[in-house]
Structure formats: C-alpha cells, structure tokens
C-alpha cells in the first residue's frame, strides 16, 4: 500500500486497512506530487448530484409505505426526506458505474445510505442535548415532533435501511454474497465502533472549555471526521464497487477515495464558521486530503472520472 509523504508531523491510523493521516500540527510544506486534474463545470457538478439524489429519493418513495401507526411511519417518511442529502449515496452509485456496473445495482445501497444518514442527522439535532447546532434550521421538520419521537424513531429508521439491502437480493442474479458483504460493511460503519463512537466523541468535544487548548485547535475534529463522514463515504464507495463486481484492488482504491472525501466534508462542516486561524488550518488539511483523494483516482486513468469531481468540489 502506498503511503504518501505529507511533509507534516502526523501519526498514521488505519481504518479498514486504509491509511489515514492524523493531522496534528501546521506546516508550510506542500505535497511533492502534482495532483491529477479532474474538471467539471459547477452546473454539471450540481446536475450529477441532483440527478442521483432524485433517483435515490424516487426509489425510497416507492419503498416506504405510510401505514398505521401514523405517528411512526409518517414521521419516518418526513424525517428521511427533510434531511439534507449528503454525497454518500451519489458516491455509491458513481463507484458502481466506474467499475462497469449499472446504477440499478447500487440503488438499494445508496437508498440505505440516505436512510441511515437521516437517522444520524436526527440524533445529531436532538433539542436540549448540548450537541452543536441542535436548533439548526435544517432540522426544523424534525424538531416539530415531540422529543420522544425524535429520540426513538432514528433507531427504527436504521433497520429499514438494512431491510432495503436484504430485499434487493435476487437469487436469479447470483448476488447474495455481494449483498451480504455490503450488509457487513454497513454494520461495521454504523455500529458502536463507527458512527456511534464518533457521535460520542463529538458530544465530548462540545463540552470543551472555551479557553482550553482543544477548543482553539482543529485537532478535536479529526476523530469525528474520520469515523463519521469519513467512514460513511468510505463505506459508500466500497459498497458501490462491490455491487458493481469490482476486483479487490478497485474496491480498496475507491474505499480510500471515499474516506478522504468524507473527511473533507467533515472538516468543512465543522470549521466553516470557525475563527480565521482554525479555518486556515482546516483548509490546509482539506487541501492535503483533496490531493490524496486525487492520487487514488490515478488508478482509474482512462475511465470516465468526470462524475468524481462532484465529490471534490468545494460547496
């Protein structure tokens, strides 16, 4: 496995055998390699993301039945579709297509990612929990429900995501092994050692004293960005590749790409409103991660990589 020289003082970590730089200090040195250029107009970028998001939502609307008790199923429907979409479902579809698969092969997994993201978002925006931005305008629909619904319903949404995966199995196409592998990927990513662990650490970080060293650096954001957004997007890319019948090296290259893309999203989301010094440091880390992500795509030179600029485009 190639480990790129970041020219910074960092401690390596590994997630699913993927090298992850642990940024701990500033550096005025740049990467020695020249990043690969992938260009796409801003209009095309939004068009690709909007198109795949619309396809995923259409698939979900066919899959979700609003039935009694309405207090559960109607709220589930509203929570899922009012949650701002992230890049993971689109990345899952793009990875599948890159390795020769069709969008339909990845649609159930992409929809499950959308569903589980909604559950995570709901838990992140519970009122009166001390979490960052618990009253975000984006969570207005969620916060219109009673706290007991907000607290318990995400735990019902997650199994629905796994149900989507299980129901996508088709014995006539001999894909049971791939579906099972994707389910395992999901359990690792969204279980107690994945997203839940990241949410716990983010909760701890929200309690930092405003004068503490941790509160004045971007270091506290590394672990949540790694285990939350990073792990989710790594899972998305790997699952898309698996469902597209990729070989192992392709799966791992796309997993690594997804990890870096997710971490970019994590740092951008956490430090977009930070002080000038924090924002500058976060931007430096994002630039490093962007270059690393581009390096992973070099393996796929000669294929249609245009959609992948969607995931490196700074919103």
UniProtKB/Swiss-Prot annotation:
Belongs to the FPP/GGPP synthase family. Dimethylallyl diphosphate binds at residues 228, 265, 280. Keywords: Chloroplast, Magnesium, Membrane, Metal-binding, Plastid, Thylakoid, Transit peptide. It comes from Cannabis sativa. One of its GO terms (molecular function) is prenyltransferase activity. It is found in: Plastid, Chloroplast thylakoid membrane; Plastid, Chloroplast. Heterodimeric geranyl(geranyl)-diphosphate (GPP) synthase small subunit. The small subunit alone is inactive in vitro while the large subunit GGPPS1 catalyzes mainly the production of geranygeranyl-diphosphate in vitro. Upon association of the two subunits, the product profile changes and the production of gerany-diphosphate is strongly increased. Its cofactor is Mg(2+). It comes from the Eukaryota. Part of a heterodimeric geranyl(geranyl)diphosphate synthase. Binds 2 Mg(2+) ions per subunit. Mg(2+) 1 binds at residues 124, 130. Mainly expressed in trichomes, and, to a lower extent, in roots, leaves, flowers and stems. GO terms for cellular component: chloroplast thylakoid membrane. This is Heterodimeric geranylgeranyl pyrophosphate synthase small subunit 1, chloroplastic. Transmembrane segments: none annotated. The keyword Cytoplasm does not apply. Mg(2+) 2 binds at residues 124, 130. It is a peripheral membrane protein. SUPFAM superfamilies: Terpenoid synthases.
């Amino acid at each position: 496995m190639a480990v790129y020289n970041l020219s910074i003082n960092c401690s390596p970590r590994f997630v699913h055998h993927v090298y992850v730089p642990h940024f701990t200090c500033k550096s005025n040195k740049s990467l020695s390699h020249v990043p690969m250029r992938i260009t796409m107009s801003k209009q095309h970028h939004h068009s690709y993301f909007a198109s795949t998001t619309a396809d995923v939502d259409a698939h979900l609307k066919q899959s979700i039945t609003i039935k009694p008790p309405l207090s559960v199923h109607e709220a589930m429907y509203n929570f899922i579709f009012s949650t701002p979409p992230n890049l993971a479902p689109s990345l899952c579809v793009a990875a599948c297509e890159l390795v020769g698969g069709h969008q339909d092969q990845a649609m159930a997994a992409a929809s499950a990612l959308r569903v589980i993201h909604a559950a995570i978002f709901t838990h992140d925006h519970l009122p009166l929990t001390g979490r960052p931005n618990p009253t975000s305008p984006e969570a207005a629909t969620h916060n219109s429900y009673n706290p007991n619904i907000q607290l318990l319903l995400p735990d019902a949404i997650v199994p629905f995501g796994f149900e989507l995966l299980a129901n996508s199995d088709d014995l006539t196409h001999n894909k049971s092994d791939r579906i099972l592998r994707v389910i395992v990927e999901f359990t690792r990513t969204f279980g107690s050692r994945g997203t839940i662990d990241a949410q716990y650490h983010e909760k701890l970080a929200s309690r930092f004293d405003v004068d503490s060293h941790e509160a004045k650096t971007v270091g506290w954001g590394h672990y949540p960005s790694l285990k939350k957004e990073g792990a989710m997007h790594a899972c998305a890319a790997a699952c898309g590749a698996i469902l597209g019948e990729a070989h192992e090296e392709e799966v791992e290259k796309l997993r690594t790409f997804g990890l870096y893309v997710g971490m970019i999203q994590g740092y951008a989301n956490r430090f977009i409103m930070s002080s000038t010094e924090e924002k500058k440091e976060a931007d430096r880390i994002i630039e490093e991660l962007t270059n690393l992500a581009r390096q992973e795509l070099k393996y796929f030179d000669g294929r249609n990589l245009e959609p992948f600029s969607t995931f490196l485009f700074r919103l």
